[in-house]
């Protein structure tokens, strides 16, 4: 089988996904064949299996080719601190988009263009340097939170419309395809004044995407839907998707990445592949815990760490990791 599988030949790994499928399929084909395997011509069995495998691999590649974004392309992520954080963490939305595409056979390169505190005016001012000069194939545009949130220091609706339109026009003139993201919420309460003001900004973005034939990721609607509680449910304590009402936590980053991938046209089955890839990413989320110990305990930890040529923090983090695995095993099934 390996001779017929270029992916396996290239990887040379027994756990290559295509090879795993081939082996499982072979076993299934041999056990489900009505005629005993010994009475089938060996070459006929192999030929049939190979034909089905080739069909499977070809269909997988075809699905990836049907997406508007292709392998080898570059995606610029233009935005503010939400985007900057989305680039700086392995579980940030920028990297989740990249890994989600890769899980579906589309390998792309990110161009990180998020700057903390930026408004539409700021993004327009650095567009040439941070995006156009780097010649991406795609750009996602996340802008609106600071234009509203910063009040008098932000950008009113009319100049915002002008700035965003100019950003899109310049990118399209440079041959860059654009996906517009509706602005995420400012506080996890749609009834607050900032979110009410943001409605007009997002309405404009939806209209502009349609007018300029840009892809659209409906992140604001997705965020509102995720935060909606059943009727009669008690008020939620703390934030669900953000660390502070604005900047995303791991769940919020997954929400954003999901919206962007759907904007790129990924199917439900492809989204499942993306989510599965995210869930098993190593060191994706840093969980910080406060551990109080006595001086005697600290002295012992220090000696143990020194004997292993490690730091106390590394030692404690390893034990916390083991505790998380234990808790996970005892948690109720999904």
Regions found by a protein language model. Give the residues of each.
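N-terminal secretory targeting modules
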Residues: 1-78, 83-90, 98-107, 133-137, ...
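Alpha-helical cap/lid subdomain in secreted, periplasmic
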Residues: 66-71, 91, 95-109, 118, ...
């Amino acid at each position: 089988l390996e001779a017929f599988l270029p992916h396996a030949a290239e990887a040379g790994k027994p756990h290559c996904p295509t090879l795993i499928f081939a082996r499982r399929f072979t076993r299934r084909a041999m056990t489900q064949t009505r005629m005993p395997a010994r009475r089938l011509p060996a070459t006929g069995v192999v030929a049939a299996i190979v034909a089905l495998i080739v069909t499977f691999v070809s269909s997988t590649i075809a699905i990836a080719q049907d997406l508007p974004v292709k392998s080898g392309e570059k995606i610029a992520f233009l935005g503010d601190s939400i985007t900057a954080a989305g680039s700086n963490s392995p579980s940030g939305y920028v990297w989740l988009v990249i890994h989600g595409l890769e899980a579906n056979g589309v390998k792309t390169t990110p161009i990180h263009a998020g700057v903390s505190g930026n408004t539409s005016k700021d993004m327009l001012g650095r567009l040439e340097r941070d995006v156009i000069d780097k010649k991406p194939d795609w750009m996602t545009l996340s802008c609106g939170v600071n234009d509203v949130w910063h009040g008098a220091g932000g950008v009113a609706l009319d100049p915002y419309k002008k700035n965003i339109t100019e950003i899109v026009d310049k990118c399209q003139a440079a041959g860059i395809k654009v996906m517009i993201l509706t602005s995420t919420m400012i506080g996890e309460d749609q009834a607050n004044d900032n979110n009410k003001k943001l409605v007009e900004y997002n309405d404009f973005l939806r209209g502009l995407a349609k007018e300029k034939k840009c892809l659209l990721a409906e992140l604001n609607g997705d965020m509102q839907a995720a935060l909606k509680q059943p009727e009669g449910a008690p008020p939620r304590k703390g934030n669900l998707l953000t660390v502070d009402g604005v900047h995303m936590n791991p769940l919020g980053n997954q929400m954003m990445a999901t919206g962007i991938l759907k904007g790129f046209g990924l199917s439900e089955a492809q989204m499942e592949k993306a989510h599965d890839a995210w869930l098993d990413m190593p060191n994706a989320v840093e969980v910080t815990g406060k551990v109080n110990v006595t001086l005697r305990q600290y002295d012992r930890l220090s000696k143990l760490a020194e004997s292993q040529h490690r730091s106390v923090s590394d030692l404690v983090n390893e034990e916390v990791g083991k505790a998380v695995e234990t808790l996970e095993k005892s948690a109720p099934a999904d």
